[in-house]
């Protein structure tokens, strides 16, 4: 077991102060390569950073040694997403979106204020932020983050809602439709943000993912909408109620991995099936798992294989083409999903051939080699981990 080493606490870095620009910006030299190095700012140079929130702050770990290199104070419930480069992570706070320099282990002064920051999507070399409380859609090139506030394109939906947007390779945008009362579909906009087409047959639209060939999928409570080659297609769920609200795609595969919930009346459904959606054949296949899972359980491997972290503590590996369960990797002990979605539960984050798995019950983070199926490292943390994310490798 590799025991983590505390490297000191960064004092008084609050989300509110950062939003007001009181936290110093990083420098201008952008990191390059898989090491996530560079001399952009601060005294640290954390390799392949992995970030983990806890109640009151965020840890930054060296992705190779799993040593805790930074401990940042951060009030409230905060969410994490890769920013799209090998240096930054997007932190969703009560004030809006904020850019965190994970290599330096410190907040930047790059912020996108707005009530109820929602989905962060990376596609076609662009990162898109959707602010639920305002309906603002803001997109930028993540490789410009090393120079401070990036040049940003903005669009505002007709009504604020819990939505998501994806910028396409041609500069167009796929964006959800809805308001505070209901969400019912998607619209496709061109590079001038003029509507090209729409589909309103997607009740409670939620989540997105991109598959091979720029097929964009969004989930519905009765199936999936797929946008590809200028057309929107509905793939219906095989059950009367078949909600797909969280998806994971891969550029290596035309298959989308999604959760699959069938009990419309459940206070908290603990699903034991996942959906594999073929964006080429427009078909949906359900795969039965030996354990339940949560919205933080879905990931993709380096070859496009579907990965599901089960409540039995195993990473279940599914051949996304055949739907066959090919392996189950032991990582942590059995666990149970909490009733409140903000409460800590195990999560999985995959980068390259390494899967990082958090264990709030044991206050640990594990690294798993997906090729060998071996746990290669374990970090012991002082606080129970909640959100799990990290920087991305450059290609």
What do the PLM-derived regions correspond to, one by one?
Residues 22-25:
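C-terminal motif of bacterial Sec signal peptides marking the signal peptidase cleavage site
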Residues 37-67:
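An edge-strand/N-cap motif at the start of beta-rich repeat modules
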Residues 37-43, 74-87, 111-126, 156-170, ...:
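Repeated scaffold domains used in trafficking and secretory/extracellular systems
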Residues 44-54, 81-98, 119-139, 165-180, ...:
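Short beta-strand elements that form the blades of beta-propeller/WD-repeat-like
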Residues 64-73, 103-112, 146-157, 193-200, ...:
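A short beta-strand motif characteristic of beta-propeller blades
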Residues 180-301:
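Acidic, serine/threonine- and glycine-rich low-complexity intrinsically disordered segments
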Residues 273-357:
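Intrinsically disordered, low-complexity segments enriched in Gly and acidic/Ser/Thr residues
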Residues 358-395:
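Blade-level signature of beta-propeller repeat domains, shared across WD40, Kelch, NHL, RCC1
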